[in-house]
Swiss-Prot record:
Extracellular side: 49-102
Keywords: Disulfide bond, Endoplasmic reticulum, Membrane, Mitochondrion, Phosphoprotein, Signal, Transmembrane, Transmembrane helix
Di-lysine motif (motif): residue ranges: 293-296
Record keyword Manganese present: no
Comment field on protein domains: The thioredoxin domain lacks the 2 redox-active cysteines, suggesting that it lacks thioredoxin activity. The di-lysine motif confers endoplasmic reticulum localization for type I membrane proteins.
Membrane topology note: Single-pass type I membrane protein
Segments forming domain Thioredoxin: 114-269
Phosphoserine modification, residue list: S211, S243, S288
Residue ranges annotated as Cytoplasmic topological domain: 126-296
Cell compartments where the protein resides: Endoplasmic reticulum membrane; Mitochondrion membrane
Gene designation per UniProt: TMX2
Organism per entry: Macaca fascicularis (Crab-eating macaque)
Signal peptide (from-to): 1-48
Name assigned to this protein: Thioredoxin-related transmembrane protein 2
Length: 296
């Protein structure tokens, strides 16, 4: 399954891959990930490179390089077991490939290793992964509008994502959250986002840490009646996030989106004449990642 999951996701996303290759971030990242392969296998780049092969062929891998590449493959397969989107699969491949490339280049020549590390640093400083720009029904808040919107109509249920553009998990979750907003957004159930990397006082007010060590980004909070009802991931006593997978199925089940959606549709049909009701918190049920999504 560790091998089949990324392959199936890759096949279903072939049209998207063609658009990725046209973007500088993915193109340059792919070149950096395959740098050692190109240098070692393509003449005349491989001519004159040191090698430990018995036949002295500088344009082929020696046994130690093969071991490193096999270890890289095993690490990528283990990490991709928990990946949900194609972006996460590709990101893991790029990240661990660059680490393996750095090790392999340092084995050849320390100068080549330093050059490769320098190129990676320049790449990280100049190229940022493209943000999700697809369709969505999401309202973006700032440090002032979030409280006003939550208090404006307490009959409306809000699901708000606290995110930061620099967090890879937030970028991977963006298309999933957008798809959920397209399916479930209605008059009584709204979706919102706030950039806590930009509005730090919001992160303090809603107790969402932006430190990479706490792994609290992204955080989803359900508001009913203007008050927080539940959040994912949960936080332990040390202030760290309890491990939770941000898949579409998990969000639907943990937040009871099907039930909230049906209740919100009744609210929209009844109009504005009904009195405000006390919010009812959904009953969170933790389920495995492999279960299928309920039919709405």
């Amino acid at each position: 399954m560790a091998v089949l999951a990324p392959l199936i996701a890759l096949v279903y996303s072939v049209p998207r891959l063609s658009r990725w290759l046209a973007q500088p971030y993915y193109l340059l990242s792919a070149l950096l990930s395959a740098a050692f392969l190109l240098v070692r296998k393509l003449p005349p780049l491989c001519h004159g490179l040191p090698t430990q092969r018995e036949d002295g062929n500088p344009c082929d891998f020696d046994w130690r390089e093969v071991e490193i590449l096999m270890f890289l493959s095993a690490i990528v397969m283990m990490k991709n077991r928990r990946s949900i989107t194609v972006e996460q699969h590709i990101g893991n491949i790029f990240m661990f490939s660059k680490v393996a490339n750095a090790i392999l280049f340092f084995r050849l020549d320390i100068r080549m290793g330093l050059l490769y590390i320098t190129l990676c640093i320049v790449f990280l400083m100049t190229c940022k992964p493209p943000l999700y720009m697809g369709p969505e029904y999401i309202k973006y808040f700032n440090d002032k509008t979030i409280d006003e919107e939550l208090e404006r109509d307490k009959r409306v249920t809000w699901i708000v994502e606290f995110f930061a553009n620099w967090a890879n998990d937030c970028q991977s979750f963006a298309p999933i959250y957008a798809d959920l907003s397209l399916k479930y957004n209605c008059t009584g159930l709204n979706f919102g986002k706030v950039d806590v990397g930009r509005y730090t006082d919001v992160s303090t007010r809603y107790k969402v840490s932006t430190s990479p060590l706490t792994k609290q980004l992204p955080t989803l909070i359900l508001f009913q009646g203007g008050k927080e009802v539940m959040r994912r991931p949960q936080i332990d006593k040390k202030g760290r996030a309890v491990s939770w997978t941000f898949s579409e199925e998990n969000v639907i089940r943990e937040f009871n989106l099907n039930e909230l959606y049906q209740r919100a549709k009744k609210l929209s049909k009844a109009g504005d004449n009904i009195p405000e009701e006390q919010p009812v918190a959904p009953t969170p049920t933790r389920v495995s990642d492999g279960e299928s999504k309920k039919d709405k």
